Amino acid sequence: MEKIKLVVAGVEITFEPNQAAYNKLINEMSMDNKVAPANNYLNRIVAADSKEALAGIITRPGAALQLVGKINEIYAPELEIEVKN
């Protein structure tokens, strides 16, 4: 399992993203529902020893979406796709 360690506001938090959690995030998100799925995703993938640290950070406005963005930038980077005719 891939581990991603981030230092957020001076606090180290470890995440363990996986395909099932990532897919669930994508399926739960909608145009008017982004924050709750982001919070759920982070709580699904945070390492047990980082749960308390995440709880302290996630209450900040915008924190959940910023964390999800950074984690998924590493976990699921954009593919280079070229169209050939």
What are these regions (language model features)?
Residues 1-9:
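Short acidic, Pro/Gly- and aromatic-enriched capping/linker segments at domain boundaries
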Residues 12-14:
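Short, solvent-exposed loop/turn motifs
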Residues 2, 16-85:
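Short, surface-exposed, charged amphipathic helix/loop patches that serve as local interaction elements
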